[in-house]
Amino acid sequence: TPMANGVEWSLFDGEVGYNSTVLIQGPGQQGLSQTVICKQAGASLIIVTGTSKDGARMEVAKKLGADYVIDVQKEDPLARIMEITGGKGVDVALDCTAGAGTIPILLGIEALKRKGGIIVAQGELASFPNFPLEKFTVKFITMKSARGHSYKACELALEQLASKRFPLELVTTHKFGLKDVDLAIRSVGGKGVPDVIHASLMPWL
């Protein structure tokens, strides 16, 4: 599922392709899958952001193709993005965060290039007070909703997995038995076993 989302959100919705510059916010299983697909699609610059607790995930992001990783708790992410891009900003901003509120959307809007960028959002917010509509329209930004994936995305994701081009074993970090389903879910959310990215359930464990 994460890899199929990677295809749908970055390739189909974000229109990432050859020489694209991309900001991926959140280095979890979704963000890392976006990293793989963006690299496969020919993106020339991939920036992944996360927090200090995401250290292990950020290292995996670099091994999967991220050119830069930014700890948003240690650096000003917008200033760093502009430094990396020479003040131009990025073509596409992908929000793969969870529970971060409006911050990823606001950063995405600011980090996009001067005109015509695309932001793909998960849309978990019920409302967005003081949305920067003027800046959004002046920059001619297109916002798309990241809501699942299509059959075509699944087919391409399976082909990507079968190609073994990327060390995807780094993403599937832990295995749990059925008796530990609750622990597995909490761990993926950062509240159980540390440094879990993607958990596999093994009935025989």
Regions found by a protein language model. Give the residues of each.
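Generic hydrophobic/aromatic pocket-lining and core-packing "Φ" positions
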Residues: 35, 58, 105-109, 133
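Residues in the short beta-alpha loop(s) of Rossmann-like NAD(P)-binding domains
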Residues: 50-54, 125, 149
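C-terminal capping/lid region of NAD(P)-dependent oxidoreductase domains
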Residues: 71, 83, 87, 118-119, ...
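Rossmann-fold NAD(P)-binding glycine/threonine-rich loop
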Residues: 122-140, 152-157
